[in-house]
Amino acid sequence: MSWQAYVDDHLMCDIEGHEGHRLTAAAIIGHDGSVWAQSATFPQFKPEEMNGIMTDFNEPGHLAPTGLHLGGTKYMVIQGEAGAVIRGKKGSGGITIKKTGQALVCGIYEEPVTPGQCNMVVERLGDYLLEQGL
C-alpha cells in the first residue's frame, strides 16, 4: 500500500458511525520533515515548524509556552502523551500528531469532528505503523 493510500483510506475517510464527517487535512511526514503523503488540503509548513514539533517530542513541554505552529496556524498545545502524541486546539478545531519510529501521522479537524474522533483516527494509524516497525 502506498503512503498516499494510507492518508486517503485511513485518515481522510468517514469517521466510524458518522457518515460525511472526516478530517479537514492529514499527512504522513518523516522525522526529517519530508512529506511522505498528504491530503490536498494539508497546509504548506516551514522547516522550523517541523523542528519545533520534533523538539517537543524529544523535550515534552517545549511548545507549551509558544504554541504549536503548522502552516502559519497557531494551535494551543493541550494534554498529549509525552514523546508519543501532541494535541493542539484552535477555536472549534485542532490537530493531533502521533509519532512513530520513522514518521509523524498528522490530522487536522474542524467541527463537527470532535477532538476524540481525530485522536482515534490519527492514533489508530500511528499505532498500526508502530506495530509494523515504521
UniProtKB/Swiss-Prot annotation:
Modified residues (Phosphothreonine): 114
Gene Ontology terms, MF aspect: actin monomer binding
CC annotations in GO: cell cortex; cytoskeleton
Predominant place of localization: cytoplasm
PROSITE patterns per record: PROFILIN
Subcellular location as annotated: Cytoplasm, Cytoskeleton
Disulphide bonds in the chain: 13-118
InterPro entries: PFN (IPR048278), PFN_euk (IPR005455), PFN_sf (IPR036140), Profilin_CS (IPR027310)
Cited Gene3D superfamilies: Dynein light chain 2a, cytoplasmic
A Pfam family reported for this protein in Swiss-Prot or TrEMBL: Profilin
Protein modification: Phosphorylated by MAP kinases.
Keyword annotations of the record: Actin-binding, Allergen, Cytoplasm, Cytoskeleton, Disulfide bond, Phosphoprotein
Intervals of motif Involved in PIP2 interaction: 84-100
Role this protein plays: Binds to actin and affects the structure of the cytoskeleton. At high concentrations, profilin prevents the polymerization of actin, whereas it enhances it at low concentrations.
Family: Belongs to the profilin family.
Subunit structure comment from the entry: Occurs in many kinds of cells as a complex with monomeric actin in a 1:1 ratio.
Other facts noted in the record for this chain: The variability of the residues taking part of IgE-binding epitopes might be responsible of the difference in cross-reactivity among olive pollen cultivars, and between distantly related pollen species, leading to a variable range of allergy reactions among atopic patients.
Name by which UniProt lists this protein: Profilin-2
Organism annotation: Olea europaea (Common olive)
Upper classification of the organism: Eukaryota, Viridiplantae, Streptophyta, Embryophyta, Tracheophyta
